């Protein structure tokens, strides 16, 4: 399947429990990292990888996410009137020309796997991409036009095999999706076949692996049947991880070692790391911000 025909699914129906109380009234995907909400970084990455159709799986509490990608005629008219052309261009670039963003609702919180199934009427029985909205890949450490999601799509087009992005995570893996591969992976961008994939394992120390999934998946159409058959797993939810694990028993599924850095912005530490990193790079305020950080650390 040609890259341009792949749709990307972003599940944004989660309640953001790890970021309370900030997420009590604000969707976690709308929390800002400097001057853009988290979800904007995700969409920018997807578009950079060549995808033109994006499906947001939302919840009734996530109207702000939908509104962010809608056109605000009043705001644009005001910026035009006040000759704020740079700001106007930035607002209009939120949803780039030629990119379509669609919304479907997940009525019940039945897990990530169920959230993906909610997108099936829009995606159809086709291959597709899944990108989790709270894990930001640092575009300053790996060009999104070439690496990670873009490379996964290229490999999928070449091999037809589903792809899962992985990173090394020494320490406790009990809160993550743990990957075990047939061969060790050392170099960034390296690929190996998945032999085991477990969501939040009870005893991660029994697994001979320090690899975790990084919220980027390119999935063949065969995953739909596995999702339909998947019973509730960890936390009583239908897990995408379980469906991919079953698929990997029947056909080759690849793990690709992530290039660059990532931040789990669904948790406070990752969010703070991302904010500081992007703040120091900000073209307008970055230099002053770096100086203020130096003073704090002195």
Swiss-Prot record:
Protein keywords: Capsule biogenesis/degradation, Lipopolysaccharide biosynthesis, Nucleotidyltransferase, Transferase
Enzyme class at the top of the EC tree: transferase
InterPro entries the UniProt entry points to: GalF, GalU_uridylyltTrfase_bac/arc, NTP_transferase_dom, Nucleotide-diphossugar_trans
Pfam short name (any one): NTP_transferase
Pathways per UniProt: Carbohydrate metabolism; nucleotide-sugar metabolism; Capsule biogenesis; capsule polysaccharide biosynthesis
The keyword Iron belongs to this UniProt entry's keyword annotation: no
Catalytic activity entry: alpha-D-glucose 1-phosphate + UTP + H(+) = UDP-alpha-D-glucose + diphosphate
GO molecular function per UniProt: enzyme regulator activity; UTP:glucose-1-phosphate uridylyltransferase activity
UniProt entry tagged with the keyword Iron-sulfur: no
An example Gene Ontology biological process: UDP-alpha-D-glucose metabolic process
EC number: 2.7.7.9
Similarity field: Belongs to the UDPGP type 2 family.
NCBIfam families tied to this protein: galF, PRK10122.1
Descriptive protein name: UTP--glucose-1-phosphate uridylyltransferase
